[in-house]
């Protein structure tokens, strides 16, 4: 892990150290332009598993453990953006399940692997089913 990354993780750790928790929320809505919700999120293991026009989740996050939070923006105008964002959210949820007990450098590597795996899955699905893309 380079010095810049180490500083980032230490800053986050210091900010979260203490007895208080952090109340978080995620909301995704289809908006006024699209017919379907192409976006997704990851919040304490919750993702938008439905095809509804909006989704939400709430969580109190403890400073005593690592958390993976994610935003996955399905690429608008490309068919299957909602599939790509959901698949990516699922990959990151599985990766985050491995965080407990890991060091910052191990978490960084798990995150890198999650990006790589999600990219591989989307590329494979894209050629077969015209799945779009997502920004994570």
Enumerate the language-model features and the residues they cover.
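PP2C/PPM-type serine/threonine phosphatase catalytic domain
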Residues: 1-136
């Amino acid at each position: 892990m380079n010095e810049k990354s180490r500083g980032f993780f230490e800053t986050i750790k210091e900010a979260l150290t203490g007895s208080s928790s952090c109340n978080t929320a995620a909301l995704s809505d289809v908006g006024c332009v699209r017919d379907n919700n192409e976006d997704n999120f990851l919040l304490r293991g919750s993702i938008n598993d439905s095809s509804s026009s909006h989704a939400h989740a709430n969580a109190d996050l403890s400073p005593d453990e690592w958390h993976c939070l994610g935003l996955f923006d399905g690429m608008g105008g490309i068919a299957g953006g909602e599939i790509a964002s959901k698949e990516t959210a699922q990959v990151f949820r599985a990766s985050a399940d491995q965080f407990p007990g890991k060091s910052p450098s191990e978490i960084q590597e798990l995150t890198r692997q999650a990006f790589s795996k999600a990219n591989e899955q989307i590329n494979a699905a894209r050629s077969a089913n015209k799945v779009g893309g997502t920004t994570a």
